[in-house]
């Protein structure tokens, strides 16, 4: 389900490029935010303050959508320290609706990699809470009972239930078997690459060629893959 558009994107000029020292602070700051989010502890005071588009729950979702390598590239590009190749720009574009004020910024080849990355991240940052609010208002309704039971059944959760509910809503509209791209399955829309990675890293839990459609199994796989991609993403930021 497409996120809704919200505030208008305001480009950042190239003179605001971040140096390596500030980038290291941003990475450290982001990692501290992730730890506080998972543990539900107060965030430490940020010096310098990380821009909203580089922190927040949407940044836990981007590695799932773009892959850890892609998410790290986007993070670095938004910090002025990496370039986005045409293939990456195209992938960003297909994940932003054409009606969004961000769409043309990402589409425009004259825009810098930094401007494109910031536009993409601002779109998700500024709309995530709207998506979350809608997801949480729906999950308690009888027609979404299967999705709620599945998310509640996740073993050893390391991500908050509200975040997982929002991701499931973003991926499948809380439908355990949406009729969309046949390569992606279930509540969390697990694809072939994600399934292969789950089997490689967690062979004790994931086996076989078929991605599970069972809501509980799919929700567990969705949770585990979100955790895996975020762990790898944070390592990629250091490389």
Residue positions per predicted region:
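Catalytic and substrate-binding regions of cell-wall glycan-acting enzymes that process beta-1,4-linked
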Residues: 58-130, 238-239
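A short, structured beta-strand-centered segment in the mid-to-C-terminal lobe
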Residues: 204-217
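Proteolytic processing junctions in secreted/extracellular precursors
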Residues: 6-21, 133
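Export/targeting segments at the very N-terminus of extracytoplasmic proteins
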Residues: 25, 29-51, 127-174, 216, ...
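Acidic helix/loop microenvironments that form the catalytic cleft of cell-wall polysaccharide enzymes
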Residues: 53-74, 168-172, 218-225, 236-239
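Substrate-binding/active-site groove segments that recognize
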Residues: 36, 43, 181-205, 222-224
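Conserved alpha-helical segments that form or flank metal/cofactor-binding pockets of metalloenzymes
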Residues: 171-179, 198
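Extracytoplasmic/secreted envelope proteins and their assembly/folding machinery
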Residues: 61, 144, 148, 161-165, ...
